[in-house]
From Swiss-Prot:
Keyword Transferase appears in the UniProt entry: yes
Record HAMAP family: PlsX
Species whose genome carries this gene: Bacillus velezensis (strain DSM 23117 / BGSC 10A6 / LMG 26770 / FZB42)
GO biological process per UniProt: fatty acid biosynthetic process; phospholipid biosynthetic process
Keyword hit for Cytoplasm: yes
Superkingdom to which the source organism belongs: Bacteria
GO cellular component: cytoplasm
Cellular compartment(s): Cytoplasm
Protein name listed in UniProt: Phosphate acyltransferase
Length: 332
């Protein structure tokens, strides 16, 4: 198995990316990596050589500030575009990048290509829950506007991922809404609710945002605008809560003593709520796995994104999505 990696994408690239690659090579004997980026820079950060790591030179980089579509069209020799081409031309089975999210979605859609029958791809991270099991949220920004039929496909794709990668035999699929009652919400959610009831997924109804971290469902579907707001609210809230805890536990001598006693448990809680432990955000609906690692990814986060991409390839997620979407259309 070979995964192409954008070595130049992300706030901590290329060092964090390369360190994450080295960690994954040590962990998985079947994994081969193509590092795409400036060859001289990459080789200067490689701590050791491996016959399972190949470097593909790219003399351009898509910056975070670049307009996504224009950048993909104009920067043909960028690390991200060449990475996607490795997958499109069957030299790699999957790809990951911590770079420009919009550009990666554009490259995935127009270079890697969309699965036949998929109307709109969806960007889907796995987010933490109190239990530590996590839940899949899609879409978080691939499409800010969506139709009910799109959300139904999100439910199917998310269900496949949860079953094949997370090992959940019958994933619970919930619809993010302002209330749990069937008739709650706007036209989009009301129509989506009716359609999801008719599918083969294990649809458990509407789910309110306040219940997400309690594990109300394994897969949560929503439009990209709502999903992105939800994602950033959860991220921001978690960071603020940990900051408040830190400020409180360092405010006096007595609280500092308490902090010393509580530190192992606090670190355990922080690790449980760290979304990077679950990998990156997958772009579902494409012919091969495309994974977006967080822009601030360190080596550990890159490793988990690679682990996730490897699992998606091993479990034939794209093929299962194509088959189940086809079956659903046949049943209509």
């Amino acid at each position: 198995m070979r995964i192409a990696v954008d070595a130049m994408g992300g706030d901590n690239a290329p060092k964090a990316v390369i360190d994450g690659v080295m960690k994954s090579i040590e962990a998985f004997d079947d994994l081969h990596i193509t590092l795409v980026g400036d060859k001289t820079t990459i080789e200067s950060h490689l701590s050791t050589t491996s016959d399972r790591i190949t470097v593909l030179h790219a003399d351009e980089v898509i910056e975070p500030t670049d307009e996504p579509v224009r950048a993909v069209r104009r920067k043909k020799n960028s690390s991200m575009v060449l990475m996607a081409q490795e997958v499109a031309e069957n030299r790699a089975d999957a790809c990951i990048s911590a770079g420009n999210t919009g550009a990666l979605m554009t490259a995935g859609l127009f270079i890697v290509g969309r699965i036949k029958g998929i109307d709109r791809p969806a960007l889907a991270p796995t987010l933490p829950t109190v239990s530590g099991d996590g839940f899949l949220l899609l879409d978080v920004g691939a499409n800010v506007d969506a139709k009910p039929e799109h959300l139904v496909q999100y439910g199917i794709m998310g269900s496949v991922y949860a079953r094949q990668v997370l090992g959940i035999s019958s994933p619970r699929v919930g619809l993010l809404n302002v209330g749990t009652e069937e008739k709650k919400g706007n036209d989009l959610t009301k129509k989506t609710f009716e359609l999801l009831k008719e599918t083969n997924v294990n649809f458990v109804g509407n789910v309110e945002a306040r219940d997400l971290l309690e594990g109300a469902a394994d897969v949560i579907v929503t439009d990209g605008f709502t999903g992105n707001v939800t994602l950033k609210t959860l991220e921001g809230s978690a960071l603020s809560i940990f900051k408040m805890l830190k400020d409180t536990l360092t405010s006096s001598f007595v609280s500092k003593l308490a902090a010393g006693v509580l530190k192992p448990k606090l670190m355990e809680m922080k690790l449980k709520m760290d979304y990077s432990e679950y990998g990156g955000a997958s772009l579902f609906g494409l012919k091969a796995p495309v994974v977006k690692a967080h822009g601030s990814s360190d080596a550990r986060a890159v490793y988990h994104a690679l682990r996730q991409a490897r699992e998606m390839v091993s479990q034939n997620v794209a093929a299962f999505i194509e088959e189940e979407v086809k079956e659903e259309k046949t049943d209509e």
